Amino acid sequence: MKVLEVKTLLSEATDRAKEYKELRTQMVNLRKALKSVADLGDSEFSGKGASNIKAFYHDHVGVTDQWIDYIDMKIAFFNSIAGAAEDKGLSDAYIEESFLEHELANAHKKSKSIMSEQKKAMKDILNDIDNILPLDLFSTETFNDELADANDKRKKTLEKLDALDEDLKTEYALSEPNEQFIKSDFQKLQEATGKGKNATPIHYNAKAYRESDIHKKKGDIEKRTEAYLKIKKEEAKEREIEKLKERLKNYDYADADEFYEMAKTIGYENLTAEQQRYFTQIENTRELEAGFKGVAVGLYDSGKDAVVGLWDMVTDPGGTVEAITGAVAHPIKTYEAISAAIEESYQKDMVNGDTYSRARWVSYAVGTVVTSIVGTKGVGAVSKTGTATKVTTKVKTAASKSATAQKAITVSKQTIDHIKQKVNKGIEVSKKHVKTKLNQIGDLTLADILPYHPRHDLVPAGVPYNAVNGVTLKEGLQKFAKVILPKPYGTSSSGRRTPAPVVPPVTVKYGEHYARWSRKKVLKPNIIYKTKEGYTYTTDNYGRITSVKADLQLGEAKRNQYAQSHAGKPQDRKPDDDGGHLIATQFKGSGQFDNIVPMNSQINRSGGRWYEMEQEWAKALKEEPPQKVNVNIKAIYKGDSLRPDKFIVKFRIGDADFEKVTIKNQSGG
């Protein structure tokens, strides 16, 4: 007999998950301890049997990894029980199978029987008095329907109970192969350690263990585990999405941050058209909001231009700099956000807008573009705001094909004066006032910088929007946005490159990852770029390559002798350095600056540690069939040097465990 008390079940599941989490922490600590011995260098631990001992600890690390995977499966299982019960509609149920199968089933039959007997008895009575007072017999249709529904619910509840029970038992058993494998695999490891007096790590036979039939099944077990954990993660996300979608149905959009987080979890494609539009507005401004705080005053003081003109136009058209002032924390993101916001506002107010919105959009766009609100030095280069004559000329040109429009423009001096007044009001602010406002950024909320915030009560400006080429205006705004980007680097008094602000990296297209500094081609700061081979590089705020991730391919790429001979010059390259490729050209690695760093010639050339490591990778790729080689290279720098101090390389060949190699950028590595 089954009894389901969900409250107790969930309480027990929570406790078990907590216990497994504590066990996992212990396993992680054990793994760290084992790995610290396995990774000891020759200078720290060498001599007779040292390699065997380190291999012994290394393979124990693999066993702890298996235990951690097993524990993760258990945690995922116990954490999913609440969702499984909710999916069956049993989230707060108390069910006794015996009661449903017997007492309630019997009650159903008895109720039908009683009603049938009562109806028969009543029919006999009515027949007896029919000649005196004819009456219709009462209908049992409603009763029968309700009784049938109740019985159907009883049966479905039993089915749900059985299904939940079977699902949980089946899923719980999925981790049993892991447990059996771990025990058998560990047994083989013990056997490889020796027997009797020789059963010590110094006699450990790593080859015997790693080539055992049991250990070779490790890859299959890992794939099963990975697939299970992926499914559990997707299930949890789907349940959360359904809950959030239900919440958003009647959401009042009052809290932009809360809406954004919910919508991001749900996924853009699962939002309604209205929700997608609101989400896009938040997305276009959210990433810059963090940059407004903290870095704003510092950037202004160091000579960077304040974001006033174009950013103010996009996020708060018709408003003033008193409402929003910021600074360029990340040039690439600044342009992307501004450009996207321009596109959003164009689609919203020109393509899909009404008379009011089109007039407002064109009036501000014309005023912005024609009066050169954005200069070439930076967003804040707005000392000259243009004249009404320029506005008139531009609008006349746009409307030259329309006599009606021409007439409308001729009489729109009041409109142009209105535009000029609005523009001037937003620009003629002293540096002292801008700095004061930057210090007040702490009070800024995300809602304040959304396009067309409702607090701005703008009247239709009267610009003849029907005679203006909106697409041209939009493209003009976006072009102006692109030229505002400040130079990514400065130059110190000693001639060294000064860094950009430290911000999260952004992804750029390959080919758009270069910048200029002191007339030299350099990499942009804080970016991620990917080659056509799929090799992914990341730079820091100095524009130095800090990491490369790649699934290597055999092939040949062109070398660039100039790039190799100039890497790290003039200050940081050493006399015995080469221009070393992080990904060798034999693996289709780029021959340009985007893959080259100053590297000690001894480690880079034949016989060196870097060279030998590359040969190992090439050998694996040349096998039949070729093995997969995955590499993760990190370049570690000191101070502002453009020359790596050392390299930390993790690589895996085929299904083997990752190997970690540290190579110092010096002779001998």
From Swiss-Prot:
Coiled coil: none annotated. Optimum temperature is 37 degrees Celsius for the C-terminal fragment DNase. It holds the Pfam family LXG. Its main location: membrane. Optimum pH is 5.5 for the C-terminal fragment DNase. InterPro entries: Bact_secretion_toxin (IPR051768), DNA/RNA_non-sp_Endonuclease_sf (IPR044929), Endonuclea_NS_2 (IPR044927), LXG_dom (IPR006829). Signal peptide: none annotated. 10 uM Mn(2+) or 10 mM Mg(2+) are equally active in vitro. Keywords: Cell membrane, DNA-binding, Hydrolase, Membrane, Nuclease, Toxin. One of its GO terms (molecular function) is nuclease activity. Residues 569-580 have a biased composition (Basic and acidic residues). It is found in: Cell membrane; Membrane raft. Its cofactor is a divalent metal cation; Mn(2+); Mg(2+). Residues 558-583 are annotated as: Disordered. One of its GO terms (cellular component) is plasma membrane. Residues 1-235 form the LXG domain. Toxic component of an LXG toxin-immunity module. These modules promote kin selection, mediate competition in biofilms, and drive spatial segregation of different strains, indicating that LXG toxins may help avoid warfare between strains in biofilms. The C-terminus (residues 527 to 669) has DNase activity in E.coli and in vitro, and inhibits growth upon expression in E.coli; does not have RNase activity. Acts on supercoiled, genomic, linear and nicked DNA. By 2 hours post-induction cells have an irregular surface, membrane disruption and elongate. In the N-terminal section; belongs to the LXG family. The C-terminal fragment is a homodimer. The C-terminus interacts with cognate immunity protein YezG, probably with 2:2 stoichiometry. The second YezG molecules binds with lower affinity. This is Toxin YeeF. It comes from Bacillus spizizenii (strain ATCC 23059 / NRRL B-14472 / W23) (Bacillus subtilis subsp. spizizenii). The lineage of its organism: Bacteria, Bacillati, Bacillota, Bacilli, Bacillales. The gene is yeeF.
